[in-house]
UniProtKB/Swiss-Prot annotation:
This is RNA-binding protein Hfq. Residues 77-109 are annotated as: Disordered. Keywords: RNA-binding, Stress response. RNA chaperone that binds small regulatory RNA (sRNAs) and mRNAs to facilitate mRNA translational regulation in response to envelope stress, environmental stress and changes in metabolite concentrations. Also binds with high specificity to tRNAs. GO terms for biological process: regulation of DNA-templated transcription; regulation of RNA stability; regulation of translation, ncRNA-mediated. Residues 9-68 form the Sm domain. Homohexamer.
């Protein structure tokens, strides 16, 4: 299952590395804003005026303020690639509504 949901970690890591401002919508409708400081399998640390730890199960959508360049492995079955021999795919993720799913992983700082 971790290979299938491998889109989440590269997306969050790109947001963290590029220090992109994000809007995080929770399942209860609350909107949080800030930058992804760190993340692991269960939570995201969102930095604004203070650091907030947000549990992933409470997140509905993460919307970046600008396009994000993302690299992910080609074994993702949900991504169509014209060249199946290619090891990595690079896509621009735009500030459309992006739903994230729970994933296994280590903390990234």
């Amino acid at each position: 299952m971790s290979r299938i949901s491998s889109l989440q970690d590269p997306f969050l890591n790109a947001l963290r590395k590029e220090k992109v401002s994000v809007s995080v919508y929770l399942v209860n409708g609350i909107k949080l804003q800030g930058q992804v400081e760190a993340f692991d399998q269960f939570c995201i640390v969102l930095r604004n005026t203070v650091n907030q730890m947000v549990y992933k199960h409470a997140i509905s959508t993460i919307v970046p303020a600008k396009s994000v360049r993302m690299v992910y492995s080609s074994f993702n079955p949900y991504h169509q690639n014209s060249n199946d021999e290619q090891d990595e795919n690079v896509d621009d993720i735009h500030s459309d509504d992006l739903e994230i799913q729970e994933n296994e992983g280590n903390i990234h700082e």
